[in-house]
């Protein structure tokens, strides 16, 4: 190798170490970038001349060169954020997103799970790329098989008409007995109050999600026997009749000498009453008064008497609940490990909204980086194996968490020192070769 050749060899070392330092600098700059995967330089030697000698084959090197940059796709640490739309992948795989990056409209892949619900209701990252997944039917909650952008923010929980009312009431046996066959006078509120022993108000929902007040009046007929009467303002049934009252259902309640619920009518399995509110569909409503000893036994159920009671204490409502609700807006979303998205609505309803899709690659380190912490598939990466999280070698989803960069700062500083020394040594080779050339030129003097 000539002195001139040593200059070029040294320059190749300088260039290689420059590339290496650039890679290290990029890793350090992105040590706090969510989902970032560090890289390392791949270098090789350069051969210019092969000399065949008696002892064997030897090669004269011409320095080094950077041949490629290899992405290190190891797992990063998970950071809990408390933000419900933040997602992290534990294991292999990438989030799939649809949109544009640098003018390219395609499906992109990323480990950055910083998502939000955008103005159109889509789960999207901060760059506007929409998260892909398997949307679910809002009516059935069944997750589909077609991949599409997950639009969850615009979903509305449809209303449900009241069909079951559960009551736990205590009716004071010391209330005056109004006599067998006593009825409720629905002329007005004052007559209903004077012809009953106790009353309470419940709220029911019709098929359109409209709320209606239904009053329940109780009459102490005789010892151990009460009647109940469901009353509504007729304006709830026909606006033209507002101000008038109508009894829409009635039945009886009997109690044992211990104050336990013995029987009630109408008995199951039929409804307690049928009602049709204005503009809505007709609905059957069944009252559950508790475990009636005799009534439930006839229906094949072990009756314990627990529920509505008649104890010597003030008449009062213990609990009242019903299964209807109005339409509701989405207020909160949550994710399971398999990527299933659950929505909680303002009406208390909870529904499955879909499932996050994930893609895995045979050679994920060969994906093409396009900026924004996103990648495109390449011939080297292979085609994406798309499916549900936690299946087919794909990792699990951790909600309210983010995957941190997998850059190890201590390793990067170590590599920086080694690279710096390599750069200095190559520079010294240039200086030394220059001195040798100077000496060679001075031989002529």
Predicted regions and their residues:
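N-terminal intrinsically disordered, low-complexity, charge/repeat-rich segments that act as generic
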Residues: 1-40, 45
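Amphipathic alpha-helical coiled-coil segments
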Residues: 14-17, 21, 409, 416, ...
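Small/polar low-complexity and glycine-rich loop motifs
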Residues: 37-407, 411-415, 422
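Acidic/polar, glycine-anchored loop/turn motif associated with catalytic or activation segments
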Residues: 426
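Structured functional modules or segments
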Residues: 436-445
